[in-house]
Amino acid sequence: MGNSALRAHVETAQKTGVFQLKDRGLTEFPSELQKLTSNLRTIDLSNNKIDSLPPLIIGKFTLLKSLSLNNNKLTVLPDELCNLKKLETLSLNNNHLRELPSTFGQLSALKTLSLSGNQLGALPPQLCCLRHLDVVDLSKNQIRSIPDTVGELQAIELNLNQNQISQLSVKISCCPRLKVLRLEENCLELSMLPQSILSDSQICLLAVEGNLFEIKKFRELEGYDKYMERFTATKKKFA
């Protein structure tokens, strides 16, 4: 795209605090945005071909609340991204990310994290440091097991659909705020589903279709009645 078009977008963003440039075939993060590090609240560069974020610029957007780079070619995230102390929404669906920076737990304001369609091989332990995290989407990755650290996750909703999960720590029942757990289309045997999820957790929507067991058998598990009480109570609340 031409420089004049980009300049026009930058000028608009200066007034609105929102920079949106989708579907433009961009191969790199626009360096012109460094003029706006103290204005921008929202950046959306989805549906481009960006393969990296510039470490020297990305951490300087001190007011940024929402960053979207869905459908790009990112393979790694720089540590400097984690300087964004006001960031509430981070959407990086359909990239090529295998892991998150070790400093990711410093994104202390983060509420919504979308990483669907990446190449994560494990549940990132850094997520357990994020105290305000509400919604986490890790669907369509390559996660094989959910470790004990999951018990410290603060999220209300966790989407793990379409992974390769065959092991699930019993500690998932200890998540203090977890209400919605999506595990559809994984590799779980019925014996690998901790009974405490049903009988002794906060979870009121558990989606497990498309695993290695029949739903009929799932409904026969001890504790299923208790789970259904929570499910029905929640349904009534929102009816």
Swiss-Prot record:
Alphabetical list of Pfam families matching this protein: LRR_4 (PF12799), LRR_8 (PF13855)
InterPro entries from the xrefs? Leu-rich_rpt, Leu-rich_rpt_4, Leu-rich_rpt_typical-subtyp, LRR_dom_sf, LRR_domain-containing
Q: What is the lineage of its organism?
A: Eukaryota, Metazoa, Chordata, Craniata, Vertebrata
- The entry's protein name is Leucine-rich repeat-containing protein 57
Q: What is the predominant subcellular site recorded for this chain?
A: membrane
Instruction: Give the keywords, sorted.
Output: Leucine-rich repeat, Lipoprotein, Membrane, Myristate, Repeat
Q: Which residues form a coiled coil?
A: none
Q: Which PROSITE patterns match?
A: LRR
The species this protein was found in? Mus musculus (Mouse)
What Gene Ontology cellular component terms go with this record? membrane
Cellular localisation: Membrane
**Which gene carries the instructions for this protein?**
Lrrc57
Membrane topology annotation: Lipid-anchor
User: Is-annotated flag, keyword Protein biosynthesis?
Assistant: no
**Where do the LRR repeats start and stop?**
39-60, 63-85, 86-107, 109-130, 132-153, 154-175, 177-197, 202-222
Q: Write out the N-myristoyl glycine lipidation residues.
A: 2
